[in-house]
Design a protein with these regions (language model features):
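Helix-to-beta-strand junctions that scaffold the AdoMet/dcAdoMet cofactor pocket
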Residues: 123-125, 139-140
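A short acidic, Gly/Pro-enriched loop at the edge of an enzyme's catalytic core
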Residues: 102-114
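Class I (Rossmann-like) S-adenosyl-L-methionine-dependent methyltransferase catalytic domain
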Residues: 1-57, 61-105, 126-130, 134, ...
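A short beta-strand submotif of the Rossmann-like class I SAM-dependent methyltransferase core
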Residues: 116-119
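Conserved glycine-rich acetyl-CoA-binding loop
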Residues: 109, 137-141
Length: 165
């Protein structure tokens, strides 16, 4: 079933509302998750000299954003949920852009890496090719897009108040 623009807006709004309402609980449940292997996997494939300019796509409360900054990189977060964006700024000290994943406004050829850890699965499947092209366009030549997503059951729809694919 093809989703229209109103359906897509509703999906984004309700998912972001869920995260905004549960931001502190989510943070307490994920603050100490170790994703160092994911960070290392992306960084090892970026060519050129460090520091790299990294976009943490769906940065949440800023856990990974802070790690990139502590490693000496220029880290910028992108987050749709206002509560998470504020938390990420406070926790990481990094710049955070608040944008919907479905309405991105990204500079072209700007980032050495895009780190999309447990975030792209929130994009409805019909929109995913477009969003991936936009993420590709924001990468410098030779830039790396890293994506990791939670294991699911190959279903698209609502789960715990959030939309996922």
């Amino acid at each position: 079933m093809k989703l229209n623009s109103q359906d897509l807006e509703k999906i984004a709004d309700l998912t972001l509302d869920c995260y905004n309402q549960n931001a502190e609980h989510f943070w307490e449940g994920t603050r100490y998750h170790d994703v160092s292997q994911n960070i290392a996997a992306m960084l090892q494939y970026i060519e050129g000299d460090r520091p790299f300019t990294i976009l943490d796509f769906g940065c949440g409360p800023g856990r990974d954003l802070r790690v990139f900054a502590e490693l000496g990189h220029v880290a910028i977060g992108l987050e749709g949920a206002a509560q998470f964006a504020a938390m990420a700024r406070a926790y990481s000290g990094c710049e955070v852009w608040q944008q919907s994943f479905l309405k991105l406004d990204l500079p072209e050829n700007y980032f050495d890496g895009v780190f999309a850890n447990a975030s792209l699965f929130h994009i409805p499947s019909q929109e995913l090719p477009r969003v991936l092209l936009e993420l590709r366009a924001c990468l410098k030549p030779g830039g790396v897009l890293f994506s990791s997503n939670p294991h699911g059951h190959n279903e698209e729809g609502w789960s715990y108040g959030r939309y996922g694919t």
